[in-house]
Amino acid sequence: MKTLKAAAARYNATSLILRIVIGLAVGAVLALAVPGAGWVEEFGSLFVGALKGIAPVLVFVIVASALAQGTSRLDRRFGTVIWLCMLTTFLAAAIAVVTSFLFPQTVVLAEAAESEVVPQGLGEVMNTLLTNFVANPVSALLNGNYIGILFWACLFGLAMKKYGADSTKLFLANTADAVSQIVRWIINLAPFGIMGLVYTNVSSNGLSIFTQYGRLLLLLVGTMLFMALVVSPFIIFVYLHCNPYPLVFRCLRESGLTAFFTRSSAANIPVNMDLCEKLGLDKDMYSVSIPLGATINMDGAAITITIMTLAAANTLGIQVSLPAAILLSVMSALGACGASGVAGGSLLLIPMACSLFGISNDIAMQMVGVGFIIGVVQDSVETALNSAGDVEFAATAEYHQWRREGKPLPAFLCK
């Protein structure tokens, strides 16, 4: 028993990134050495099954809790922060659509399958969307209807905000925390799941799958870097009328670098608050806007959801029209806010976006598995983009207010 506890302690003390890399390597080696060992595949099946089981509950309780706990005491600066977060999240999803159209990706799934229902156009997509919105909420949870889950979670959260007692809201918040902890436990076992998923793919398709996954990863990271180094600086320039890059690079260096390794916007909140203090921001403002940004500023998540969904559509041969892609951008932006700083949260929202195009939950969860395989890099870059943006937009809102009041901007911005 002591040996088992010691092994578990050593396992938990090892970086998750290192464990995933080891699991990936072990899965590939086992696939080449013993391709007929079916028991290894079961690790991947169990991992994906656990994710499939917890994901609907995760989306519902996190969205409902976030809305129920929402605050209405927001001045002009908070309004600016919310606007910037929502604007850039939508732009991130839209840019991801453009890059996916320019560089379309397909992936090798564990089970070759076709979409159960291939939508013929935007009208059919809209019909599916509206029908799924008002589906029975219990049925939506049981069947993984993420559009219905999101709709009912929003209504439940808004109603709870108005009519719920403080103790009830606390219970909802505690439930969200408990479900998030279950997700962390599952993701803590991701190395074993990744081992099984890689084993299945390599034993069936050879090592060439890593080339395809590499192209998909390159598209994801490239789109995120474009967002971080081009789009966000341009928006900051529009608000501050000065060189945005001193602020951008400082946020990437002091916030993004830490977030890259923690892989959690929520875990990076203390780092961001310390940086806000160094930037001379109002503590009453950033003490609320930074946690708010960790919830709704999800540029990287929107990019991940959009690109992975379109890759699934391309893999299944589904033709996605431009209007349907725009609809996907909106859905990805809204869904990304549900990622809420949960490790791997954006990947768990891929099925919601996939459901727009009639892609079955089984295929969508295979895409989630692919996401975990490349997540060592993807999730780190995504979190760095999101977390650095939290400080960038808090600073932009504050400094924009300074400009309106005739107060000089910090010296480092005027270089």
Q: What is the role of each PLM region?
A:
Residues 8-33, 48-51, 76-247, 407-415:
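Signature of multi-pass transmembrane helix bundles
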Residues 39-43, 75, 171, 207-215, ...:
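Membrane-water interface of transmembrane alpha-helices in multipass transporters/channels
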Residues 41, 45-49, 139, 170-185, ...:
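Short amphipathic alpha-helical coupling elements at transmembrane boundaries
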Residues 50, 86-90, 94, 221-225, ...:
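Hydrophobic transmembrane alpha-helical segments of multi-pass transport and channel proteins
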Residues 67-76, 162-166, 205, 241-244, ...:
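Juxtamembrane helix-boundary/capping and inter-helix hinge elements in multi-pass membrane proteins
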Residues 75-81, 181-188, 278-294, 322-323, ...:
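Membrane-interface alpha-helices at helix entry/exit sites of multi-pass transporters
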Residues 254-336, 408-414:
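Helix-loop-helix junctions within the multi-pass membrane cores of secondary transporters/permeases
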Residues 307-415:
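Transmembrane alpha-helical segments and their short flanking loops
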